[in-house]
């Protein structure tokens, strides 16, 4: 019987600034595809046609204890679709073998929402920041598994750029 890898420790970096002890949780982007069913003559059913990423495929959210600091506010309404650099670093461990793996997700995008939550004197406060990303790179123990760059039309999975030929076909 095997045990799953569980997140034991994590950190979040925003524009290179560490949120150790402040970041509380991270919801990493769901990598979802836009699929459209197609059913042509002679087909007994439909087949999903892959039209790239869903519109919200690279959305993420993270929460922190307390009120956001100046680093977060400085990036609010920043110019550029990749103006907000975020890095998640996680240490996952299996409890049966003790094996640990480093998981890193590098993202760039724009802050969509800064929710400072409800403030009550003498009680814990939490803020949430939503970011719509245009860049996503997932590595595990230094091995790149997925890299998506929507602006530069790059989509690599295990080192294979699945859009390389498409870029050539349209002169890029």
UniProtKB/Swiss-Prot annotation:
Q: Which InterPro entries match?
A: Tail_tube
Q: Name one GO biological process term.
A: symbiont genome ejection through host cell envelope, contractile tail mechanism
**Taking the first listed entry, what is the main subcellular location of this protein, grouped into a coarse class?**
virion
**Any single Pfam family the record assigns to this protein:** Phage_tube
Compartment(s) of residence: Virion
Keyword list (alphabetical) reads: Late protein, Viral contractile tail ejection system, Viral genome ejection through host cell envelope, Viral penetration into host cytoplasm, Viral tail protein, Viral tail tube protein, Virion, Virus entry into host cell
What's a single GO CC term here?
virus tail, tube
Name the domain of life this protein comes from. Answer: Viruses
Family to which this protein belongs: Belongs to the P2likevirus major tail tube protein family.
**Function summary:** Forms the virus tail tube.
- What's the protein name? Tail tube protein
UniProt organism field: Escherichia phage P2 (Bacteriophage P2)
List the gene name. Answer: FII
